[in-house]
Amino acid sequence: YRTRHAQYKADPQSRRLHAAHPMIPLWDDHESANNPWVGGAENHQPGREGSWQQRRAAALQAWYEWMPVRDPAPGQNRGDYWRSFAFGDLATLVTLETRHSARAQQIEYGDHPGALASQEAADHFLRDVVGATGRPMLAPAMETLVMDSLAASVRSGQPWRLIGNPIPMARTAAPRLSAADLTRLSSAAPAHELERVARLAERGALGLPLYLDPWDGYPAAREQFYAGARDAGASDLLVLTGDSHSFWANALHDASGSPQGLELGTSGITSPGDFALFGEAGARLLDERLIDSNPEVLWTDGLHNGYLRLRLTPSQAVADYVAVSTVLEQEYGLNRLRRMHITPGSGGLDWEWR
């Protein structure tokens, strides 16, 4: 892990970035292993790779050594990494830790093949397996910090409450794909992606989540988070999200349909977009079907690399979704894909595209 961090930090543009700007970094999964939880990881094999606890400890130690953050307080668990920042009278930002402090093991579709047998089986799977209580995402101490920070922000009259969130929060079912869609995607996708097309079609036909590693795999924990924010007087969250290699603009709601805020998701800097291997036409088709299949998804782009630029003033927020023309050369062009204007409203957040 130290060698890999050193490799990244040797990049001249990474050095310039760290020299020029303060950063508030969050980890997700690949700082340790793919899809970790408190007791292991999807891509950790104890028989060949030893103790998960030792591997995680090494990963987190290297992360603290190489990233621009303070070391934990004496006696504090390195995995208990959550923070709150107040930006004057403008905003509060609270960052979440969703991997190493409380997360229950992910549910895998492959372990429940019967969930795809019928709509009744899929509904049972979502309700009683994925939706089972007692599967936490956040540590209780972190939830206390988050809700106390949100309540303090509301009391002080700050207009904005931001959540630094490693993984997608919105309800995102797999896209519903027609026979014609499948034909188009099968002709556009490389051979190793054809199995993925079939999985998307199966899940989409039954209204099952696109993925179960994000908050969609922990709906009871998500409802608990929303309830805490609501009790703090904060149903106007701006949730800033990474992980998915895609751009997102999502309208968040609790199970009763009450608005909880907006989620702004950024694509990867250099990692391929989630649908990039389907080519431009295939990626656009999948984006359109995701929007059609999900009331919470206002817009998404799974093709481009880039970044999200968010500017806050007391009266409005402006979110620019910026794509880069290439990640293979130092010279590149910028293209603003969408611009969202957001204003505080009486019932949460109002927004429009401009």
Question: What is each of the regions a protein language model found here?
Answer:
Residues 1-354:
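Metal-dependent phosphoester/phosphodiester hydrolase catalytic core
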